[in-house]
Amino acid sequence: YGHVYVARVAMGAKMPQTVQAMLEAESYAGPSLIIAYSHCIAHGYDMAFGMAQQKMAVDSGVWPLYRFDPRRIKAGEPPMHLDYGPPRASVADYMRNESRFRMCLGFLVLRRLDTIRFTFLSHTGPA
């Protein structure tokens, strides 16, 4: 769908990029889509740190920021503009802040422990 304006933003990471994307999307004559990182209580951390967590998502490379503007093609420019740099933070640190990821990691640990327990019990039962 090369005719759709698409941007991925995180207000807590780069407010100017978010505003720029909104202005570009609003001025585009065709369909526009803005995909925004939106912190929420279900992520499992204090909402007072929501903007900082958005920045951590971008800094870790988990949430890359970009703008795809089809108008740039007509101007002889690449339509995709990346608005982020190389990762500056750990993905593990980002995930550790959110209980939604800790729950998944906890499940994996429990599943591994259950596998070990099953193997142990299956080899130590009555002959």
PLM regions and their residue ranges:
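Short catalytic-loop micro-motif centered on adjacent basic/acidic residues
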Residues: 5-10
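Cationic, amphipathic, low-complexity alpha-helical segments enriched
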Residues: 103-124
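Glycine/aspartate-rich loop-and-adjacent alpha/beta segment that forms the canonical ThDP
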Residues: 12, 18-110
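Phosphate/pyrophosphate-binding betaalpha-module
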Residues: 1-2
